[in-house]
Amino acid sequence: LNPVRTFIENKYLYERVSAEENMVAAMRVLRRRLDEGGAISITAGNRGRQLAEAPFLGGVLRLATGAPALARASGATILPVYTLRADDGSFDVTIGAPLTSQQSNKDAYAKEIVAQYADQLAPYVRDFADQWRGWRYTAALDSAPLDSGSAA
């Protein structure tokens, strides 16, 4: 893990759960924290058993559906967080609008959450493209669409 990124987290962190070795076990721990009323933080990415895609800056954004699945199963609210480095070297942190869905189907739920996230993320990436580290989660519109069982 990057010490620059984890330095501030470590001041407030109860526990770090890594999915590097066992994603299923990590998700169980996160679900338990939610069931206990805790807050969790998940970095958006495309590592997971299922992906959902949404239109994004003329292409598509492909993300793992683990966070939406946890939110749906537990009733938790997803609050996206956007962090930008300011000119003076400090960081500006913005908590976005809650990502919500009334979809009863888990795949439709995840797709709607990813679409809302993509819509909220787009202005930050458009205005601060040099600071975004998620380009690897994007694809051109003409690339192959996901099938229902895609994995990272």
Say what each PLM segment does.
Residues 10-11, 23-152:
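Non-catalytic C-terminal accessory region of glycerolipid acyltransferases
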Residues 1-21, 49:
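Catalytic core of membrane glycerolipid acyltransferases/transacylases, capturing the structured
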